[in-house]
Amino acid sequence: MAMSSGGSGGGVPEQEDSVLFRRGTGQSDDSDIWDDTALIKAYDKAVASFKHALKNGDICETSGKPKTTPKRKPAKKNKSQKKNTAAPLKQWKVGDKCSAIWSEDGCIYPATIASVDFKRETCVVVYTGYGNREEQNLSDLLSPISEVANNIEQNAQENENESQVSTDESENSRSPGSKSDNIKSKSAPWNSFLPPPPPMPGPRLGPGKPGLKFNGPPPPPPPPPPHLLSCWMPPFPSGPPIIPPPPPICPDSLDDADALGSMLISWYMSGYHTGYYMGFRQNQKEGRCSHSLN
């Protein structure tokens, strides 16, 4: 009995000595592990030194810019000015097709160079289809109107394609079923919605003919811009040209832009046909007077 009790009593101290760590029995001195004060100070010091260096660098760059930029710009301008002044003298000659600005209305018309004065850098142009002559500066002459029109059409086509892609994407997200109808309505040219201009008078009553008192080449006015039409005119996929419809009756569905567009279009069409009728009657009267004198 004494040996068994002694053996059991001697085994307990061996088990207690084999325990290395027991949680919760004491306070561990590991609070310094989460102390990042030194790290924060080092970060703040690095950021402050970087900002200081960056500030000094900006001051040096801005102070050096004004010294270099003024020297480069005059050289580019002089080159472009030399090209512009030398091009008209070498480009234009008698018989060339060009476009010139009529001094009375400021519009561009196709013309042909009749004579050139290289000393004065001027020329005399004859407006195609009218016979009017006018002196122009060689530097003011423009490319033939066909080339200008082609460039304008290409730019307009590119802009229309870009706007069509953007509108198609937005409309597809709203109403996928109406995609074919929208494409058909957009493919039609915008100027087909306007009534066609009145036919020009016959060869006996045209402007620029002998016996008539037309001072300049008054062509029919161009149609209104497409953005003005789009704000008030509903799209028509097909059909013959029609008269612009009146504005809607309901005032709630009509905003200021739509009302202004409708008013301007009505004024434009009224003045267009009124001016044509008055000019046509004047041509008839002057034509009769010239025939009676002959």
From Swiss-Prot:
- Which compartments is it annotated to reside in? Nucleus, Gem; Nucleus, Cajal body; Cytoplasm; Cytoplasmic granule
Swiss-Prot/TrEMBL puts the cross-link Glycyl lysine isopeptide (Lys-Gly) (interchain with G-Cter in SUMO2) at: 51, 209
**Xref: SUPFAM superfamilies:** Tudor/PWWP/MBT
- Compositionally biased tracts (Gly residues): 1-12
Signal peptide from the UniProt entry:
none
Where is the stretch described as Disordered?
Answer: 1-32, 58-88, 156-222
Known Pfam families for this protein? SMN_G2-BD, SMN_Tudor, SMN_YG-box
Q: Which GO terms describe its cellular component?
A: axon; Cajal body; cytoplasm; cytoplasmic ribonucleoprotein granule; cytosol; Gemini of Cajal bodies; neuron projection; nucleoplasm
Which CDD domains does the protein's record reference?
A: SMN_C, SMN_N, Tudor_SMN
Pro residues compositional bias: what residue ranges? 194-204
Q: Which family does it belong to?
A: Belongs to the SMN family.
What is the protein named?
Answer: Survival motor neuron protein
Report the gene name: SMN1
